[in-house]
Amino acid sequence: MPKEIKEIKDFLVKARRKDAKSVKIKKNSNNTKFKVRCASYLYTLVVADKDKAEKLKQSLPPGIQVKELK
């Protein structure tokens, strides 16, 4: 089941959880979507600012698998 997250800090907390398996990054012309797969939910964060999206990408935990989609 998907759930949308509005705050970047909440997304980073979810990404650092033990059951977080992977993060998918999907870039459009208008915004960037970050999707973290946990055990029960797929959490989604939509970021419109490209600079914030780049900073968020760099602040993801190092042990998690990151996959970039088109």
Swiss-Prot record:
Gene3D superfamilies registered for this protein in UniProt: 3.30.720.90
A Gene Ontology biological process term: protein-RNA complex assembly
Keywords: Ribonucleoprotein, Ribosomal protein
Cellular component annotations (GO), alphabetically ordered: cytosolic large ribosomal subunit
Pfam families: Ribosomal_L38e
UniProt GO molecular function: structural constituent of ribosome
Similarity-based family: Belongs to the eukaryotic ribosomal protein eL38 family.
Descriptive protein name: Large ribosomal subunit protein eL38
Gene that encodes it: rpl-38
